[in-house]
Amino acid sequence: MKIKWLKNIFILFIILIFISAFSSSYSSLNLDKLIYVLALGIDKGDNNQLEVTFQFSNPLSPDSAGSEKAETLSNTVTASSISSAINLANSYQERQLNLSHCKVIIFSEELAVEGISEEIYTLINDTQIRPSSNIVISKCSAKSYIKQTKPEVENLISKYYEMFAQSSKYTGHMPDATIGKFFNSLICNTCEPFAILGNSSTNSSSVHGSNNIENIGVAVFKNDVLVGELNSNETIAFLNMRNAVDRFLISVPDPFNHNNYIDIYVTPLKSRKV
């Protein structure tokens, strides 16, 4: 009798283990119920509101899995905060927004000059936002930045957003700036944050192509307020002082012919001792 009672207890225990192990799968979200945000743009709206733009791949596009460039979609929501904008966007989307694959976060210059600490804290506290997401301050609106970004080589725009900042290592024209680094500098008593400076290339005479966005320079902050910017040459000097650039090319005026420039390619002669 006692053995039979112990056997029943053992069977019940096994059943409870299976129930607890598989019950979470019923509450989890399937992949076909999610839509992944690739880029997040934040602009200043009217009446102290924010205009938040979400860019994501079109899951119904036939080119999403092919060799052609995958189609992207974007929606803009006006709300009092980023969290409210996400909640509002979910109310009319067929699928739930997921930010775990967001590669870049863009703030407009208009918003950044007023301070973005509240938005930074909101994003950092969101478990879906990766600290490695690039942060860009756009001289045009964040919505326009997203709309005009059209990679020339990469088929997947998510790959472009992930890779473009890596050119800082061999050009020095932009910093490697992420929201995680920005937040750490924001809470540091001896540091100041900085971000990638973005702009529409339609305002530039030096860049032409299908991608109408250029990322050149550094957006300089005092605490959470945008206070200035560095051009390409100043950015090279800034990154060189921080040992954050491997090699770079600069053009200097020819001292013997003021109409010409000399290109100087700078690389480390020896490895650093410290």
Region annotations inferred by a language model:
Residues 2-274:
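Membrane-proximal alpha-helical signals and transmembrane carboxylates
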